[in-house]
A protein has these predicted regions:
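Membrane-interface extramembranous regions
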Residues: 1-77, 84-160
Length: 160
């Protein structure tokens, strides 16, 4: 293995593990994380996430519930696939699509002046230029991972 291919492999591993860990953490905050809330709010984590999704004022309530119940599980699976490296191209593409969708929704909310939690990792994560910069960077990393995973496939074909 040449030095440039070692570097690309190291970058690929770093990107997939970092993005995977972020997705697993994001899922955890929506599935099991007990966040501070007033004693009178007996809400489950998915119900708190549903409130964040509803804050975007984009979906009907039935769709909000569906998203709040399923998206964290999808994030968890994608995160674990990235960390393990299984189905890397598919996981990388799913990550880029998810982050692209999240980023578009956040830009829309920010442009409309909505002061709402982004829904990324808890209710204290209000959409701001900082969250846009962070999620834009994550999207760029996911797109780089897609390119690297496709490059890895084409290199494997050329060695046959």
């Amino acid at each position: 293995m040449t030095s440039p291919s070692r570097t690309l492999r190291a970058v690929t591993v770093l990107l997939r593990v970092a993005l995977g860990a972020i997705f697993v953490y994001a899922a955890w905050t929506k599935l099991v994380h007990v966040q501070f809330r007033p004693f009178f709010m007996e809400l489950t984590p998915w119900q708190l996430f549903a409130m964040e999704v509803n804050g975007y004022e984009l979906l009907p309530l039935k769709a909000v519930e569906l998203v709040a119940r399923t998206l964290p599980w999808f994030e968890l699976v994608v995160g674990l696939l990235l960390i393990t490296g299984y189905w890397l191209r598919t996981a990388a593409a799913a990550t880029a699509l998810l982050l692209g969708g999240f980023f578009a929704l956040m830009i829309r909310a920010y442009a409309k002046g909505m002061e709402i939690p982004c829904g990324c990792s808890g209710p204290n994560d209000i959409i701001s230029w900082k969250t846009l910069l962070r999620d834009g960077s994550l999207l760029a990393a996911a797109m780089a991972l897609v390119v690297l995973s496709l490059k890895k496939k084409s290199e494997a074909r050329s060695q046959k």
